[in-house]
Amino acid sequence: MFKNTFQSGFLSILYSIGSKPLQIWDKKVRNGHIKRITDNDIQSLVLEIEGTNVSTTYITCPADPKKTLGIKLPFLVMIIKNLKKYFTFEVQVLDDKNVRRRFRASNYQSTTRVKPFICTMPMRLDDGWNQIQFNLSDFTRRAYDPCKLSYPKGLLLRQTLLRG
């Protein structure tokens, strides 16, 4: 999707106050909802993703699972509000050996586990709004050896940015 796009600075893939914030995202909703609301704390439009289980209500990008984002920027930045419920996000990267690796961070896990194709890790959210900066290059290097990145899937949101 962004493979032939000049990538420098920030590349926004989700912006809740845009006219179509989920245009390139697929939505899965079962026993929950995905809707745009005005947040009382910041008095701005936000995307609320809420469900009874993190595996039944979520968004994924790109919408077509056969496509890839083709983004080479090393950082994933998200602004997330702590709703005091289970939260997780997942991102998949393609390393320099052409191996897809997934990283999953969640606020309900207590230990880090590194397996050949997935690394799961705990994440703590402060009360209110949190800025999550995920250094994909560093996490990939520390978990799987030195790698260069291009990532195809995954993510969760007021604003989601990728930056170099």
Curated annotation (Swiss-Prot):
Pfam families: CFA20_dom. Coiled coil: none annotated. Keywords: Cell projection, Cilium, Cytoplasm, Cytoskeleton, Flagellum, Microtubule, Nucleus. Signal peptide: none annotated. It is found in: Nucleus; Cytoplasm, Cytoskeleton, Microtubule organizing center, Centrosome, Centriole; Cytoplasm, Cytoskeleton, Cilium basal body; Cytoplasm, Cytoskeleton, Cilium axoneme. One of its GO terms (biological process) is regulation of cilium beat frequency involved in ciliary motility. GO terms for cellular component: axonemal B tubule inner sheath; axonemal microtubule; centriole; ciliary basal body; cilium; motile cilium; nucleus; sperm flagellum. Transmembrane segments: none annotated. InterPro entries: CFA20/CFAP20DC, CFA20_dom. Cilium- and flagellum-specific protein that plays a role in axonemal structure organization and motility. Microtubule inner protein (MIP) part of the dynein-decorated doublet microtubules (DMTs) in cilia axoneme, which is required for motile cilia beating. Involved in the regulation of the size and morphology of cilia. Required for axonemal microtubules polyglutamylation. Microtubule inner protein component of sperm flagellar doublet microtubules. Belongs to the CFAP20 family. This is Cilia- and flagella-associated protein 20. It comes from Rattus norvegicus. The lineage of its organism: Eukaryota, Metazoa, Chordata, Craniata, Vertebrata.
